């Protein structure tokens, strides 16, 4: 199927979202980029936005509604857990995005090429899905920057990080926190079982260290 790459990309992107969330601690949820500036979303608000906005895009633009039968979802705030803790956000997003993935796998080329409403314009569903993936990646990047501001280690999200050994050109490895989403949820529910990081090593881990 011509658009299988979009389904495959969503399958991995949803895991990357939960993986980044797993790097935070519960006490981090109220943290904003600047403590005295309410314009920047807190960690908790980023999780809320991801859950709510993805639900709205899929429901209203792609016609995929996975929250209609959820018993643990607040009616006034679709796609949100009843308790807004780090673990509950991860479980809720993993469950709902898994249902969306299953629905996407059933769609044919005609569905992907059909037009839908994107705010005030018409676009193909394939176009909307591409934008959705980029939107999610944007907010995930914001959270990764906040992890650095908090002084936290970072496992891989796409490729090497400073904590997996540094730069790609120096052959630093890609090390994910967990081997699968299932292992992630099980490990975090047990208090955390992330794969150990080797650290920065003896080479520069950024492009212009001076």
Regions found by a protein language model. Give the residues of each.
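Helix-adjacent hinge/juxtasegments
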Residues: 60, 65-107
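Short, contiguous alpha-helical
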Residues: 7-18, 29-75, 117-210
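Hydrophobic alpha-helical core bundles mediating ligand binding, dimerization, or RNAP-core interactions
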Residues: 10, 14, 21, 93-101
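Acidic catalytic patch
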Residues: 104-119
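Membrane-proximal, proline-rich intrinsically disordered regions
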Residues: 24-26
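Active-site rim elements
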Residues: 1-8, 82-90, 130-133
């Amino acid at each position: 199927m011509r658009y299988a790459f979009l389904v495959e990309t969503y399958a991995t992107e949803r895991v990357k979202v939960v993986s980044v969330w797993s790097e935070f601690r519960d006490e981090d949820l109220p943290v904003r980029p600047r403590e005295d500036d309410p314009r920047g979303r807190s960690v908790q608000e980023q999780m809320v936005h991801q859950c709510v906005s993805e639900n709205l895009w899929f429901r209203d633009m792609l016609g995929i509604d996975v929250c209609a039968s959820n018993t643990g979802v607040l009616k006034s705030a679709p796609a949100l857990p009843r308790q807004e803790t780090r673990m509950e956000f991860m479980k809720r997003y993993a469950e709902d995005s898994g249902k969306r993935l299953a629905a996407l796998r059933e769609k044919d080329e005609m569905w992907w090429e059909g037009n839908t409403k994107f705010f005030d314009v018409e676009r193909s569903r394939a176009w909307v899905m591409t934008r959705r993936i980029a939107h999610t990646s944007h907010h995930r990047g914001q959270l990764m920057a906040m992890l650095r501001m908090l002084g936290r280690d970072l496992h891989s999200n796409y490729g090497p990080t400073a904590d997996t050994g540094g730069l790609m050109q120096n052959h630093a490895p890609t090390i994910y926190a967990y081997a699968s989403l299932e292992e992630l949820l099980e490990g975090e529910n047990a208090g955390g079982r992330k794969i150990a990081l080797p650290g920065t090593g003896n080479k520069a881990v950024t492009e212009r260290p001076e």
